[in-house]
């Protein structure tokens, strides 16, 4: 479901950018899509692994072990987010070169990716909180957050690109802000859960 919503969001981004900003911007977004999915897939793999560990402890009703697992998973998620963000941002020019992105659209690609991947900690936060919620039996909240984020992303795309003229940077910023909203919603719902009791 998460991937389906990501597809909807990405297709909306592509349609808006292509219609308003033209062929070069559209080509840039299409070119970096594989990088975007690689980063997202890595983050999802990490956080889903944490979710499996937490769900096992939660299902076994081992509250002390559960608390420790959540603490260590949270710490590792923070460390991974920091290292991943720094590494990706430093390595972006080289990565774009390895992928043989056409020279004329490289600046557009980098403008988009620097803003988007500056929000990697927020991607990690959303996916981590979503994984924790699923581990506790709540699969509705992550989906709701994802749908809300997709709608906000489209609205912000139109505002930042049409009204403010921020180009592909505006499209990337819209995604980061939408991710922030999704993260905040999931974090709030997670704070309401008493881990000693099953969710309903």
What is the meaning of each model-derived region?
Residues 77, 132-155, 173-176:
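Alpha-helical transmembrane segments of multi-pass membrane transporters/permeases
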Residues 14, 51-52, 93, 130, ...:
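Interfacial helix-capping/hinge residues at the ends of transmembrane alpha-helices
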